Design a protein with these regions (language model features):
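A charged alpha-helical hairpin associated with nucleic-acid processing machineries
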Residues: 20-21, 62-70, 98-114, 120-252
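Phosphate-handling DNA/RNA-contact segment within nucleic-acid enzymes
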Residues: 1-110, 127-128
Length: 252
């Protein structure tokens, strides 16, 4: 520190061993025990430990993920541990970072449609939306992602602490597909009351569609996005999705 005193790298933090896919410990994560920041820190990166290439608990979740054809991606280590203890075995988490291209492609090795369920606070919802947009360029036929959006200011661990396991199972059985998640989350941020707003949002959708590299996937996403948009303009879009956030202060 400033006084040339040595201090443990994980001082006053709860330590989580992080294993590679073979089950060998290659690093550690540390979570604060109070409200200070950063909430999580990890071991320095090395040839054996690259955060963006790994998913916490994948070594224990992979067999269940293949069997159940689903992989649940949560936000934090405690969420993974709580769900695993409650017999939801195919659960992993990014290593305290944003969900990455490498983690998406890694999850696709075990299921064609992994599920993201981040926390229900504003930060978690922003992270979910950011993950959704990140996935678009890499979509190909039969490879996608889906979302479970938790109610305000909840996380999987708090659900289980409050004995709401059955409520959580209902949410997990009714995920939102990627296209719907992006459309309803983004369109809920604007009013679409005048022509300029409508033109701006239409252009926003066009820009999103252009990021999809696979042409067949791009074609069908464009068709579905435009269909949802025109239904919303006509006021005939009666579809509702439970717990999709109505407003996020910033999606950037």
């Amino acid at each position: 520190d400033a006084n040339n005193n040595f201090k443990d790298f994980f001082y006053k933090r709860l330590i989580f061993p992080i294993s590679n896919i073979q089950g060998k410990v290659v690093g550690f994560g540390g979570r604060v025990l109070n409200n200070s920041n950063p909430k999580y820190i990890n071991s320095p990166e090395s040839d054996y430990f690259k955060k963006r290439d790994m998913l916490y608990n994948l070594n224990l979740a992979k067999d269940s993920a293949r069997q159940k054809k689903n992989l649940l991606i949560c936000e934090g280590y405690m969420d993974v541990i709580s769900l695993f203890q409650n017999n939801i075995k195919s659960v992993v988490a990014p290593l305290g970072t944003a969900f990455t291209e490498e983690q998406l492609k890694l999850s696709w090795r075990y299921t064609d449609r992994p599920t993201i369920m981040f926390d229900g606070d504003e930060a978690g919802r922003r992270a979910s939306f950011k993950a959704a947009l990140m996935c678009l360029p890499f979509l190909i036929p039969n490879k996608t992602i889906q979302f479970v959006t938790l109610p305000n200011n909840t996380d999987p661990d708090s659900y289980l602490e409050n004995k709401k396991f059955n409520d959580l199972l209902i949410l997990l059985k009714n995920p939102t597909k990627l296209l719907d998640f992006i459309f309803y989350t983004s369109s809920n941020q604007i009013s679409l009351q005048d022509a300029d707003q409508k033109i701006s949002y239409d252009k926003y959708l066009d820009d999103l569609i252009e990021t999809i590299r696979d042409k067949k996937t791009q074609y069908f996403y464009k068709r579905e996005f435009k269909s949802l948009f025109f239904k919303k303009l006509r006021g005939t879009n009666s579809k509702t999705i439970a717990a999709i956030p109505k407003k996020i202060s910033s999606l950037k």
